[in-house]
Structure formats: C-alpha cells, structure tokens
C-alpha cells in the first residue's frame, strides 16, 4: 500500500508551500516522511534534499544533520511538549541534541533570544507547559523548532487546535519569523483560510498524490482540478483574519 506516491515538491528560502487535502489524503504522512518520523516499518524511496543534501536514508550523524536542517511544529500544543520539563529544559534539550557545537553561554543566549522572538517573557523558562494557554504552548513549540536554526519547518496544522483569535496571532508570528530569518515553511492544512493568509504556493493532495500545484492566486482563483474546486467549496475558512 502506497500512502504517498510520486511526491515531487520544491521549497525555496523564505517561501511557504501549503500542502492541502482532506483527511487521509497523505499530507501529514508526506511531512513526516521528510523528517523520518514514520517508523522503521515505513518504506521510503526517492530523494529528499535539504540545502542540496540527500536525506532519504539518514543514519547517525546524517539523521542529526537532518534534524538540525528541518524541524516540525505539531498540531496539538497540549501534547507536543513534555509535561515533566520546564520550558528552559525543553529548549536546552533541543540545543544539546542538535547543536553540540555551541558553548553553554551561547546556548543560554540562544534560549533567551528564542523566547523573545516568540513573544514570551524570560520567566517562562522556569515554568511547565500546564501553566500556559494553548497559544502560549504553541509559541513554545515554535521556539523549540527554531532552536537549532533549521532551514525548513514543517507546520502540521499548527493553528487548528486554537481559538480563531489566537490562530491569527500564531500565523502573524510565523510570518514575522520568516521575514526575519528567511526560513521555509511546508504548511500542512485543510483550512484554505490559513492558506490564503500565509502561503505563497499551494499543492493539493488526493489519495497520496499531488493533483495540482501552483502559485496561491492561480490555484485559489483558477483551480485546474475538479477535486481542488470541490475542496474550495467544502473546507472551512478561517474567519476574522
């Protein structure tokens, strides 16, 4: 069984590609395949290149290099953070694992800078995830993803578990971070309102295959695929943004 078949996508620096489709279309599987998060039983063929490096079969140091180059923000900020670790410990763990080249002082400075970048105060370092709101937890998850200075972040439904007003704040934060760093986003979502707000290009998935891809305006205003037109008519929109 091929959960994802024949995927061919290119992401440039400072670009957001939205991967959209209904539940079961394969979009989350595609995102996890890039980061080698599917488990040993998953069979992946082809190439996955990040900054020219083929990461299709990473092991050992290569896997660590992949994790440094590409990170993920999960859908649920309530389960993606270890409840036993403070925010400071969570961010330090990411740096110790993926940036052993940094000194202790550099890591401390990096952690403080990450909190500032995502709009949290320094006293958050000593607090635990349950002490934060959903939006604040997602900011912590974003800071963790940014910790090793990746070139790519996969955003897997990063706002769907949040209130609409908070969704806008998180999307604005992601946009500002991209403008400041040039990072690329692969945005996995079913919400075309989110797509309209942040994406540069759109790829539409159905049954594990991409059925349409193009610039945002072309796909939304002049969809070539009947399936894309059906999605545009059926999926929820993000109000209030």
List PLM regions with ranges.
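ABC transporter nucleotide-binding domains
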Residues: 1-239
